[in-house]
């Protein structure tokens, strides 16, 4: 199918939903009871998403927020509440019917919030060519939309263009664990259902890094659907457009605290837990972003850690037999690859089969935020305990 055919089919699907209230298959999590206090019912009826509200927990008063694929405006109106009357919200959408609903209800939502006028503007446009000024946005949000775009890498480059240096995105979307085959890619209906259009997680993130984003990490992920053996996940990711690097005041070394024994960051720098590593200004800037900062110590002089140090982070597997239950783990970030204390090497976006002992480690607080989990066994397992290797070690 051509890009034009895909775009037209998706637009018609959402236009029909706007007119009829048709439900589109996306795993939503809106708190409608709260939203009804200021969002009109007409908007709530045409609200679809896969992670809700996408990224708005980090909004600060007075910021400018962009919603890609704003639909009827639900996330824009929630953003409006959070940025306050001094902030600004821009929503872009390609479907006239959705834009009409959003524009019609903007003054109502503003009045319900007690604002003198609406601080939300809805613009018609494509995600691959956004009608938004360069460097004008503090936060980009998007809710189960980018996977519908035929040219996702263009979308990521557009996101980078419109963000201010130091800006960030938080987007929820559908990704797959394996490549989506051609017979699904050419299924128009499944494009509208966020399935045929899904990228593998690794390809999704690599497109963002290629556009210039760093510090890309998971906020949450949940299994969604399985079609012909392909698992689809709903995932929410955050990343940053770092400002120009400046020489840090005194920081010359970084020491990995854990919980991994080794990691490689998005700039290709390798670290071993407890061992100081010389770093440049750009790396220091990256390691100061929220996903990295708790895991590193930055110092003027080399700083080593021992396992007895309270700053050392580790979660060791139990020394017991394990069970293979069909569980797979996918590293989601912010590292390119990592190694745990049982010598498993995880690469971002690549599923790795794990046993029950490793699953318990990855479900711990220190590890959970870095992984998406799927199960391929559908409950059909033997449950037999085994020693994973001749030495009794795991896997």
What is each model feature region?
Residues 175-195:
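Short, glycine-/aromatic-enriched active-site segment of Class I SAM-dependent methyltransferases
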Residues 153-168:
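A short glycine-rich, Lys/Arg-flanked "PGG" loop and its adjoining helix->strand segment in the class I
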Residues 27-64, 78, 82:
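Conserved alpha-helix/loop element of class I SAM-dependent methyltransferases that forms part
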Residues 211, 217-223, 229-395:
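C-terminal lobe and adjacent flexible extensions of AdoMet/dcAdoMet transferase-like proteins
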Residues 197-212:
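Short alpha-helix
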